[in-house]
From Swiss-Prot:
<feature type="zinc finger region" description="C4-type">
    <location>
        <begin position="60"/>
        <end position="75"/>
    </location>
</feature>
<keyword id="KW-0862">Zinc</keyword>
<comment type="similarity">
    <text>Belongs to the RecR family.</text>
</comment>
<comment type="function">
    <text>May play a role in DNA repair. It seems to be involved in an RecBC-independent recombinational process of DNA repair. It may act with RecF and RecO.</text>
</comment>
<keyword id="KW-0234">DNA repair</keyword>
<dbReference type="GO" id="GO:0003677">
    <property type="term" value="F:DNA binding"/>
</dbReference>
<dbReference type="GO" id="GO:0008270">
    <property type="term" value="F:zinc ion binding"/>
</dbReference>
<keyword id="KW-0863">Zinc-finger</keyword>
<dbReference type="InterPro" id="IPR015967">
    <property type="entry name" value="Rcmb_RecR_Znf"/>
</dbReference>
<keyword id="KW-0479">Metal-binding</keyword>
<dbReference type="Pfam" id="PF13662">
    <property type="entry name" value="Toprim_4"/>
</dbReference>
<dbReference type="GO" id="GO:0006310">
    <property type="term" value="P:DNA recombination"/>
</dbReference>
<dbReference type="InterPro" id="IPR023627">
    <property type="entry name" value="Rcmb_RecR"/>
</dbReference>
<dbReference type="Pfam" id="PF21175">
    <property type="entry name" value="RecR_C"/>
</dbReference>
<dbReference type="Pfam" id="PF21176">
    <property type="entry name" value="RecR_HhH"/>
</dbReference>
<dbReference type="InterPro" id="IPR034137">
    <property type="entry name" value="TOPRIM_RecR"/>
</dbReference>
<keyword id="KW-0227">DNA damage</keyword>
């Protein structure tokens, strides 16, 4: 009995779906089966949405976000506070902060973090354009909203050193106990950060 359980067309669909983040082989098979079962209502609209996205989505020349316009919708929004610049690693991080509804300023997407082990240096990231934006004036605070990883913190220190002479306040996101978090389930590093960043009650 052969290993193949379906034709090459379905195998190709599964292979492509498995390349998406968060989808392993099993999840890709489930997604493929769902698409096949609902092909009349999903395949056409999905293919059209993907074609339109491929043809119209661009990176914002100001902040690095992705959108169908350049500058992006966020950079064009005059209700945003132009004096606060939130620096993030990825567009996914930008979207996560936007979902929180807490950001009133504008963004700058670095496109990753400094990682010597992976061969990622300053020239591989959107750091020079960040320095240009801050140096142009009008920004009073730079919020370094990078991940609390070694590479993330290395990147934050590097950026801080570069903008330290530009007379802007540099802050970072607080680290510690998440809302609804139980202390017994938190790692030692998170607990230590929470203790260092404690506030009056």
């Amino acid at each position: 009995m052969g290993d193949r359980i379906c034709g090459p067309e379905i195998e190709r669909l599964i292979q492509l779906l498995a390349r998406l983040p968060g989808l392993g082989p099993r999840s890709a098979r489930r997604a493929a089966l769902h698409l096949i079962r609902k092909r009349e209502e999903l395949f056409g609209p999905l293919a059209e949405a993907m074609r339109v996205a491929r043809d119209t989505i661009v990176s914002c020349s100001v902040c690095g976000n992705v959108d169908s316009c350049d500058p992006c919708t966020i950079c064009r929004d005059e209700r945003r506070d132009p004096s606060t610049l939130i620096v993030v690693e990825t567009v996914g991080d930008l979207w996560a902060l936007e979902r929180s509804g807490a950001v009133k300023g504008r963004y700058h997407v670095l496109g990753g973090v400094l990682s010597p082990l992976d061969g990622v240096g300053p020239k591989d990231l959107n750091i020079s354009s960040l320095i240009e934006r801050v140096a142009a004036g009008g920004i009073s605070e730079v919020v370094l909203a990078v991940n609390a990883t070694v590479d993330g913190q290395t990147t934050a220190h590097y950026v801080t050193d570069l903008i330290s002479h530009l007379n802007v306040r540099t802050t970072r996101l607080a680290h510690g106990v998440p809302v609804g978090g139980e202390l017994d389930y938190l790692d030692e590093g998170t607990l230590a950060a929470a203790l260092r960043a404690r506030t009056d009650f």
